[in-house]
Regions:
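Sec-dependent N-terminal signal peptides
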Residues: 4-13
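Sec/Tat signal peptide C-region and signal peptidase I cleavage site
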Residues: 15-19
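Generic helix N-cap/helix-start motif at coil->alpha-helix transitions
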Residues: 20-31, 62-75, 104-114, 127, ...
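Alpha-helical segment of the N-proximal tetratricopeptide repeat
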Residues: 26-43
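Residue at a conserved register position within TPR or TPR-like alpha-solenoid repeats
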Residues: 34, 78-80, 119, 151, ...
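Alpha-helical repeat scaffolds
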Residues: 47-55, 84-101, 126-136, 158-167, ...
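Terminal, low-structured helical/coil segments at or just beyond the last alpha-helical repeat
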Residues: 229-266
Length: 266
């Protein structure tokens, strides 16, 4: 039925529209041009909007798929010339979409906040301030790791580190290390964050590489880090991530080599 409606709309409007099934990666590929600092080209925004309109609603079934489509529409809307792209404006737009969508379960607070997590606007101080203040006034926001991103955007680096550390999301480890080194001047906190790589869920290769580069450049040999603790950390990184070598040696070999070279120094 969704494809029939799209075909009828295309015929009435004289525009060729081809319905496509929902694909999260395809949605992102078609809207990522709107996720930039500054103003996207009008043609880019138009193409993104038209792609979202072409997605067959009958293939958007699961709650996460519905959230992904709303998130995508919020992103495109925020890049559209002449609209109210303030946090209040985006919230009103998203709330209207949510009201017209049937969910199996209500959104959690972190899921809702994710609709407005336009990280490329973290240097827009008014947007950052409004979004941050909304989160601080909303119970449950402390479970949204990117509260730390918006705290950092406002110069609240201690809070940003604490939010990240409490949530322990893998993608925030490098942020914690950088905040601790560049803004808090606290190698101990940087090391505590780095050690999260060896506890719980594994990090991706790029995440491990970024963290290990900073460990090598700024923590190895630092008097604030006891040698025995650093050696233990390096051993654990070697043990945990060597397991990934056989399946993807090209990606992991340089990373594991660096870890082992650092271990040899001890």
């Amino acid at each position: 039925m969704g494809k029939l409606f799209l075909l009828m709309a295309a015929l009435m409007g004289g525009v060729a529209v081809h319905a496509v099934d929902f694909s999260n990666s395809a949605v992102w590929d078609n809207i990522k041009g709107c996720c930039i600092r500054g103003v996207p080209e009008a043609a880019t925004v138009k193409a993104a909007s038209e792609y979202l309109d072409s997605v067959d609603a009958n293939t958007v079934k699961a709650d996460w798929q519905k959230r992904a489509m709303i998130r995508a529409r919020v992103i495109v809307f925020s890049s559209t010339a002449g609209v109210d792209a303030s946090f209040a404006g985006l919230k009103a737009y998203a709330d209207n979409l949510i009201a017209g969508t049937e969910f199996a379960k209500p959104m959690s607070v972190p899921e809702y906040l994710g609709l407005f997590n336009n990280w490329w606007r973290n240097d827009d101080l008014q947007y950052a301030k409004d979004f941050y203040e909304y989160m601080k006034a909303t119970p449950g926001s402390e479970k949204f790791p990117d509260l730390g991103l918006w705290a950092a955007a406002l110069g609240k680096y201690e809070e940003a580190y604490d939010v990240y550390f409490a949530n322990k999301a893998r993608f925030t480890i490098i942020r914690m290390v950088r905040i601790a080194l560049d803004h808090l001047d606290d190698p101990g906190k940087a090391f505590a964050a780095a050690k999260l790589m060896v506890s719980g869920q594994s990090c991706t290769a790029p995440q491990v590489k970024e963290v290990m580069n900073l460990v090598a450049q700024r923590l190895i040999g630092n008097d604030a880090i006891p040698e025995a603790e650093m050696k233990g950390f390096l051993k654990n990184v070697n043990r945990k991530y060597t397991a990934y070598l056989p399946n993807d040696p090209q990606t992991w070999e340089p990373i594991i080599s660096q870890v082992r070279n650092l271990l040899d120094a001890y």
